[in-house]
Amino acid sequence: PADPACANRPSDLPGDYRPFCRPDGLRGARIGVPRPAASDRARFRFSGYHDGADAVFARALAAMRDGGARVVDAVEVPGAEQEPDAEDELVVLCHEFHDGADRYLAARAEAAGAGPRSLSEVIAFNTAHADTELVLFGQDLLERAVATAGLDDEGYRAARARCVASARANGIDYALDRGGLDALAVLTTAPAWCIDHVNGDTFLGAGYSIAAVAGYPSITVPIGMVHGLPVGLALLGRAWSEAVLLRLAAGLEALLGLSLRPAYAPSSILA
């Protein structure tokens, strides 16, 4: 209730979502599949960045059709095709992280009677213990975040507005409204990659990113494995559509009937 994002919460939202989790939840639904980005520089990439994961994703879409859903291919999402302004998203990240981290740390230290009370104190601790805390990575983002001017900063507000517009009005809302869709289906992300202390992360893409930027709900369902690594399908919806997404996800989960158990790979060389 203290979250300002919930200030406009509709009064008719259900108090119990369990009745929406039905095995026939896909029947009659209209699911849109955004077309793969035309460029690696697209702001949001929904699929097309890992062949093995794409194949599993395609099989899951076929299963959704078998389950009674109308799957609409090549849905247009204008905001996704824009060249990314990484600086905008970084500005938002740093401002919000500084604000949230300071609030959390202050409350935690107050309750525990010990510990760092701010992001500045975390940075100072890391610096004082660099031989153990900063061996494998620095704290550049922490330092950039702590230098921000708060959530009333004009630059932050402008950057956030641009990010939200691309993900909402020109993104999820546009696609759902234009196609009369219940949700969008995207590849959640590529299979997990190995930790590489020399070259860094091998991050290929994440279909759910647009929902995170919009502040809209999403849910991911396990749909299979690639080289023993799990792959998921994410369903993205408009604001306050949790009931719809739970119904669709429950239907897909029941239809696939998978039981995927996590396990340690014996080596980074996967067959």
Predicted regions and their residues:
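Acidic-enriched catalytic cores of C-N bond-cleaving enzymes acting on peptides and small amides
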Residues: 1-15, 43-82, 91-126
